[in-house]
Every structure is written in C-alpha cells, then in structure tokens.
Amino acid sequence: MTSNKKSRLPPYQPGEHVSPSVHLNCVLLTTTVVNFLDLFQLSSVLFALPNIQQALGFASEDINWVLIVYNITFAAFLLIAGQLGQRFGLEKIFIAGTATLTISNVINTTAPNKGALLAGRAISGVGAGLTAPNGLAILSNTFPDPESRNKALAIYTACGPLGSTIGTVVGSHLACMSGWRSIFWLCLILTGLSTILACLFLPRFAKRKDMPIDIPGTVVFTAGVALLVYGLNDSSRRGWTSAAMLTGIILGVCLLFVFLWVEAKVSNPAISSYLWKSGPFLVMLVAIFAFGGSFSTWFFISTQLCVNLLGYSTILTAVYFLPAAFAAIASGVFATPLIRLAGEKNILVAGLAITAAGAVAWAFAGPRIGPAVPTTGRDTAIIFVIGSPVALVPTQSILLREVEAGNHAVAGALFNTAYQVGASVILAGANALMDRSRANVQGVRQVTIDGYLNAFWLIAGVLGAAALTVMVCYWPGKDDLVERQTEEANAVGPLAVDKVDTSKDATASARSVADTRL
C-alpha cells in the first residue's frame, strides 16, 4: 500500500522554489544521468584494457576482471538496494549510490596496482547496484499516471544504449590521448555532479517502516547471483571444463533455488508472494532477461568483431555505433504514442522482433561484403538498437503495473537482475560458440567470422523466442488493465513533487501530481 503522508522537501532544494513541471523534469534528468553513467562506466574501459594491462601488470588472462568484478557486485547488490530504498527512503539510497560511485572513482584514478583498481571497480558496481532499482522506483512514483510514466521511462531507457556507445567513444579517445586514468577522472567528475543533482532535486520519499528487510533471503540471493555471474563471466577465460567455473555456476543456481524456499518460509519475504503468482510479471522478467542479455552480448561481440577481425581502430569502431545510439533516443520519443496507438503487447513484440531482425542482419555483415562493411555495420546497428526503447518501455510499464507502488524498488531490482544475469548467460553461450570456431592467424588463435556469425544467430534466436513467449503467454485483461490504470492515476504517491503547502489536503496534492505532465 502507498503511504498517504505528504513528503517534505529539504529547504535547500530548488524544488521548493520552482514549478511542479520543472521539478519533475529535474527529477527525470537526475535519474536519467545516473542510468547513463551506470553503463558508461562499464563500456568506457572496454578499449582501455590493453593500456591498463600494461600499466598495472595484469596477466592477459586476468585483465577482463576489470569488467567482471563490476558486473558481479552490480548484480549482487540490486535486491538489497531495493529493500533498503523501500525501508529508509528511495532518495537516500539513491544518493548513497551516487556517493559510492564518486568515492570508487577516487580509488580508480589513484590506483597504484591492480588490486586497488579491482577494489575500486567492485565498489563502483556496488554504487551502480544501489542506484539502478531506486532510480526506476523514483520515476514510477514521481510519474504515477501511465502516459507521463511511459514518457519518462522512454527517456530513461533510451539513455542506456547512449551510455554504452558514448562510453566506448569517449573511453577509447581518452585512453589514446590522455591515458586510461583520464577515463576515471571523467567518471569522478560526472558521478560527483550526479550526487549534487540528486541532493538538490530528489524530494524525500516516505519510509516503509512496516517492511522489515528480509535478511536470510537477501543474503542467499546475493551470494547466489554473485556466484552465478562470476561463473558465467569466467567461462570465457577458463573454459567450460574449469572446475572453479562449474562450481560457481552450480552453487549459484542451487542458492537461487534455496532463495525460493527461504522466501516461502519467512514472514517478511523480499519478494512478495503475489508476484510469483503473477503471470504478466514473470513473462516480463523473461522478456527483459532475453532482451538485456541479447543487447549486452550484441554490443560486446559486434565491437570485438570490428576491432579484432576487421581491423578497425577502437575510436573508429566506437564512432560507427554513435548513429545507433541517437536512433534509440529518437525511437524513445515515439514509444509512448505507439503504445497508445497499438497497445503494450503489440509494441513489445514489435520491439523484440526489430532487435531480432537487427541480429539477423548482423549475421550477414562480414568481411565478405568488402568496402560496404562500415555502412552495413552502421545500418544494422541502427536496426538493432532502435528497438531498445520500443521493447523496454512496455516491459517496464507492464511489470510495474503488476506491483504495488510501495514495492517498486524491489521490482526494479528484479528487473535489473534479470538484465544482468541474462547478459552473463547469453554472453557465455556466445563465447562458447565462438570458441568452437577459432583458427591460427599468424601463430595466434583467433575467432573466425563463422564464430561471430553463430553468436549473432544465437542472439536472434533468443529474441525471437522471447517475442513468441510474450505473444503466447501474455494476455492482458481489459477490465483489470483499466482498473489498475485508474488506481495509479488517482493514487497519492509517497512523493509530493509540488511545493509544500500545509493548507492543502492530501487529496489536492495527489491531484496536482497526477495531472502533471512532462
């Protein structure tokens, strides 16, 4: 249930002195910038790994830990972050996350050795894990009616691909021109500014003291996700016959099953029991698992193909993906009108189908095309990425509608966990396919074009299966949909984004929030 108590803005906040519409947009800007940075910080070091390896003495088989450790802590801390946000206030945990990101980048910029850098990257993952679920919950509670929420989610979602792409462009340029540490200096500046924005513009959210933290379930879930993500990410380094890798995966899966058992026994489960019985909620988790995993895998494989096989420079490779990132923003603008015109289910299926078509197009884009490769790669990237907001906006909207407003942070945690675990699972599968197609090139075993193409076919198959799953398994009930949308439009969220005015009653405050538009 949502609290009817009005929240108060700290007196130092500009939100106390501006119109509700301006304040709404400032909240959207703050959460979107941090979402952008979560992916920017991951992709920006991708092409700087050789420089880092040489400077800090990483072994060639260990350098990927700069990426892996970020993924592990990011995924592992999502559920606890969602619960902490609901218990102590969404904005408090969000600000704690941005502050953690800032501190971690201080460590990264000054890291004297590889241990210090890995520690800093692990802390960065914790910060990202604290911000991701609470940022989504902040938006869903700030924009309670479906139309304005979908507009906000479209903008929020579109900046994800932009963060990945601009991260590769900026990171590769800085690594070549100013050294790899300059990447973390830039991240330090941006995360510091994000912390200031969050302190200035995020209102206070109601604390849910009636929702104690599920400590046993959270501990088991965190350990299970961490081991699973570790094992899957390490498979590309150790191979599928490694005892350490198999142990991590098996223990991770077993702990996640134990988590389900714990949730059925405890009196205060982290994930409310009604969610496990919600067909639409589970279908949306499958959709985000498939889409998130496919997008992350596609981005990694396509950039590696351009650099390792086609011989492009890192900067040129990154630039080729820029049009796709801006195309995602353009498609995000049209996501909400399309949903209103054709319905959430149809647009979701269309978004998954578009990205699957983009993966199929990539499966035909190889060196055999000759001079057309740059143009073809750019165009196929646009096809793939343009479906991102089209698929994610209805997915988020449907998922959040199945959840009580007070549980949106945990729902956001599950959303992001499905995304991260999907990325690890599908990338591991793609790496296994590529490893089967290696050949000796000048004494070095490299992945052949057939290996990359097989990986793109895997991505297309996963996305196609997800589209079919949504078509077959998700059937929205018209009456239930209207009822839920009416409840949301009339709800008094835990957030009062208008100026504090004690002379107005809670009903008037709720009406001002529900009527506000972007």
Swiss-Prot record:
Keyword Ligase: no
Domain of life: Eukaryota
Transmembrane residue ranges: 27-47, 65-85, 88-108, 123-143, 152-172, 183-203, 212-232, 242-262, 281-301, 315-335, 347-367, 380-400, 409-429, 455-475
GO molecular function annotations of the record: transmembrane transporter activity
GO cellular component: membrane
Protein name per Swiss-Prot or TrEMBL: Major facilitator superfamily multidrug transporter mfsC
Residue runs in coiled coils: none
Subcellular localization: Membrane
Chaperone listed as a keyword: no
Membrane topology: Multi-pass membrane protein
Family, as annotated: Belongs to the major facilitator superfamily. EmrB family.
Record's keyword terms, sorted: Glycoprotein, Membrane, Transmembrane, Transmembrane helix, Transport
Residues with attached carbohydrate: 233
Induction, per UniProt: Expression is induced upon voriconazole treatment. Expression is also induced during germination.
Protein purpose: Major facilitator superfamily transporter that may be involved in A.fumigatus adaptation to azoles such as vorizonazole.
